[in-house]
């Protein structure tokens, strides 16, 4: 297990309050750092928040998720110094959801627990998730290059069928693709295991190779496994859609990405707690929040694609209907 501490110096002109006596301790997803996506965005948000608010940041990268509970218990049982203003503990990633219901909460009012990202609402724990259905829907609709009846299909590579956020991405992309006139959208799961499929980039790459030329677009919602799809796109000149962040640098044939601005959400949530703002224990951020969007890669413009303004104008309503139907 890797652990490290960051004491980051903020610029002299910063206007935010000084929280130099505050501490934020984070346990990241096992093997997640370096995915150039979701986990790296969270890490970037934590580092930016540490600079902005001038707190001490302690980061743990466990080899297995079970180590996360031991790290938490060490934090829970460690007494705070009298001059410590706040101490936040962050579970970063839905892999730790199984801990929520039976978690012992701190008695010290200066301590708070957070979890990124989960749909569970638990009293005493600050949780949130950033949706991706609307942004994926727009990416799917944009991927239809010709709706004049020509046969064209898309392929979605997904981690597993159990992750609700993966399901949002899969459903959104497929629904948008079909709504805009695509002829079909197949889905392939890398794993049937509850937490499987996120670190299988070789398998993702091989499956795409076996289906080279069978699809107009390749979209992946599989954590670090996405890099296998990006490699396939780069080497075989197939169109692909990025996930979690702007992935246009991975391949010139990735001309759009579904972006979840986890860094923005992390910065704002930690800032609110350090400033003792009253916020809900559970928050849901959808397309209206600005934390999810579909972006075009550098030098790619909207006029390359079919006009989907009739879909864009209704995307908030479309996402609301989906969320209500899947509660």
Predicted segments with their positions:
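Hinge/cleft segment of the Venus flytrap/periplasmic-binding protein
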Residues: 271-327
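Extracytoplasmic "Venus flytrap"
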Residues: 24-45, 49, 58-66, 94, ...
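Periplasmic-binding protein-like
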Residues: 26, 82-94, 116, 213-224, ...
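C-terminal motif of bacterial Sec signal peptides marking the signal peptidase cleavage site
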Residues: 8-11
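Flexible loop/turn connectors
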Residues: 239, 245, 249-293
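An alpha-beta-alpha
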Residues: 46, 137-184, 282-303
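Flexible loop/hinge segments that line or gate small-molecule binding clefts
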Residues: 108-130, 245-252
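Hydrophobic alpha-helical segments within soluble ligand-binding/sensing domains
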Residues: 128-152, 258-277
């Amino acid at each position: 297990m890797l652990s490290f501490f960051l004491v980051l110096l903020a610029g002299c002109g910063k206007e935010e309050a000084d929280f130099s006596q505050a501490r934020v301790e984070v346990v990241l997803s096992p093997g997640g750092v370096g995915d150039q996506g979701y986990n790296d965005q969270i890490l970037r948000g934590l580092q930016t928040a540490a600079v902005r608010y001038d707190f001490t940041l302690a980061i743990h990268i466990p080899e297995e998720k079970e180590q996360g509970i031991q790290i938490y218990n060490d934090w829970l049982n460690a007494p705070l110094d009298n001059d410590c203003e706040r101490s936040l503990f962050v579970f970063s990633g839905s892999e730790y959801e199984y801990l929520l219901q039976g978690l012992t909460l701190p008695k010290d009012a200066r301590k708070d627990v957070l979890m990124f990202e989960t749909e569970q609402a638990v009293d005493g724990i600050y949780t949130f998730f950033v949706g991706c259905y609307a942004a994926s829907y727009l990416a799917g609709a944009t991927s239809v290059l010709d709706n004049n009846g020509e046969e064209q299909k898309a392929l979605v590579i997904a981690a597993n069928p159990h992750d609700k956020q993966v399901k949002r991405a899969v459903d959104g992309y497929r629904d948008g693709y079909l709504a805009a006139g695509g002829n079909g959208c197949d889905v392939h799961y890398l794993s049937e295991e509850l937490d499987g499929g996120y670190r299988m980039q070789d398998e993702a790459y091989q499956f795409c190779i076996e289906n080279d030329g069978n699809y107009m677009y390749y979209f992946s919602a599989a954590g670090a496994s996405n890099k296998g799809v990006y490699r396939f796109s780069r080497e075989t000149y197939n169109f692909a859609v990025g996930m979690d962040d702007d992935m246009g640098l991975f391949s010139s044939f990735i001309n759009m990405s579904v972006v979840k601005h986890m860094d923005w959400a992390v910065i704002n949530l930690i800032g609110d707690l350090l400033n003792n703002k009253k916020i809900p224990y559970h928050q849901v951020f959808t397309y209206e929040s600005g934390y999810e969007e579909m972006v075009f890669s550098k030098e790619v413009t909207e006029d390359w694609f079919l006009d989907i303004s009739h879909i864009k104008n209704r995307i908030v309503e479309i996402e609301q209907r989906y969320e209500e139907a899947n509660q």
